[in-house]
Amino acid sequence: SVIDSVNFVRGQVPEGSFYAEFWSREEEGPGDAYWIKSYINGELQTGLQDIITCIDAGASSEGAIIDGIPFIPPIRRAVTKFDSDDDGNFLSPFVKGDSLYVEIHSVSLEAFDFLNKTAIQINRPGGFSELFAVSLSNVPTNLLVTNDQNYPVVGFFNVSSVHGLGNTLDDDEIRKIELYNREW
């Protein structure tokens, strides 16, 4: 999938804030799986909420035929991270001078499954709810150790096509936000 644009938009909270989203149309043909990565100011985002995956632009589950449409808002806007200060006040996700680079990786359905299972293993709420959670375990892999079967392997091998595009929140981008009234 090719990214058409990465845009900054006027945020709602806090006042005067900026959010971001990318625009891309999902490839023709059902069952396409994607992994979206983002880099803010050149740094790969690796938090729990940064494992962004979807099938067919996020508009379908496996088996449904929804094809060739733009990525849905929850997917294309997931590159905006919300945070708060020590007093609980929301901070603007982006400030003037920030850059955002987005990559779309076309992955196999097996890699999609691996990423989602990994996210479940990583995102553990703790406390009483752990009694009812899926037990911790290594996520099944497609890697195999041939010389020492006692050596555990974690990870997943996948080759994919990748397309990336970025933007910087500079004076020109702020003018475009105002000119085109870009909002969420």
Segments (PLM) and residue ranges:
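A sequence/structural signal for flexible, mid-protein segments enriched
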Residues: S1-W184
